[in-house]
Amino acid sequence: MAAAAGDADDEPRSGHSSSEGECAVAPEPLTDAEGLFSFADFGSALGGGGAGLSGRASGGAQSPLRYLHVLWQQDAEPRDELRCKIPAGRLRRAARPHRRLGPTGKEVHALKRLRDSANANDVETVQQLLEDGADPCAADDKGRTALHFASCNGNDQIVQLLLDHGADPNQRDGLGNTPLHLAACTNHVPVITTLLRGGARVDALDRAGRTPLHLAKSKLNILQEGHAQCLEAVRLEVKQIIHMLREYLERLGQHEQRERLDDLCTRLQMTSTKEQVDEVTDLLASFTSLSLQMQSMEKR
């Protein structure tokens, strides 16, 4: 019998037998030649101090507790064997539904500083926080991101910094406004141009459905009313409007219209008097009105 047990040790067996109340021993085969271990044998072993098992365990080297350990392990599937060795508290923690951890207090403070710095036009702090890994898309309780604040303030440099670090130009705040909407409401033409280049949607500028063409027309009407401004200020504003419209029409695929704007921009650069600038302004206003009419016809 001992020899048979030794043979069983050489070839481990697993699984259940067909005999009632008997099963194969795993993971260490301490069985007879049939590969079976009887619960009756185990009971008699406990009652007789282990004598009933000595002959079936390689000459009595194993104690009844060793067989108890084997019985405890044998019905466990492989994944359960590891579980038996893990403390109960750790198992309970592992069984809890996985919850995504939010930002730490330090990170929350950094994100708030990013928004505050963008709102305060603090370019250096914004750049440092972005380089330190602050998320440019993080919003406050009203859904406003640093890009919303910078766009509303008209700070083109901060807007470009945020876009370069992954800010979403189409992210909406709690009221549904995108950064492009806010830049348009505050008449910040250069910011609109930067946002358009950064991937802002061009299908509608704000909740009222106004486009950069509407904004350009309004701005040009103000310039045509003749408010007292120096020549350079008027030229700069007209140039900004041309750049915005050129980017907008390029996004719409209207390349021929963009070429006309390029011609106007060249003429603007050659102006030296206010009358010449006014002439370019009038041409640009006519171009804008015509483009709006064409858009209205296309929608019909």
From Swiss-Prot:
Residues 141-241 are annotated as: LYN-binding. A motif (Nuclear export signal (NES)) lies at residues 283-293. The modification Phosphoserine is found at S58, S63. One of its GO terms (biological process) is regulation of intracellular signal transduction. Residues 1-27 are annotated as: Disordered. The modification N-acetylalanine is found at A2. A motif (Nuclear localization signal (NLS)) lies at residues 99-117. One of its GO terms (molecular function) is protein kinase regulator activity. ANK repeats lie at residues 109-138, 142-171, 175-204, 208-244. Keywords: Acetylation, ANK repeat, Cytoplasm, Nucleus, Phosphoprotein, Repeat. InterPro entries: Ankyrin_rpt (IPR002110), Ankyrin_rpt-contain_sf (IPR036770). It is found in: Nucleus; Cytoplasm; Midbody. One of its GO terms (cellular component) is cytoplasm. Plays an important role in regulating intracellular signaling events associated with erythroid terminal differentiation. Interacts (via ankyrin repeat region) with LYN (via SH3-domain) in an activation-independent status of LYN. Forms a multiprotein complex with LYN and HCLS1. Interacts with TSN2, VAV1, DBNL and LASP1. This is Ankyrin repeat domain-containing protein 54. The gene is ANKRD54.
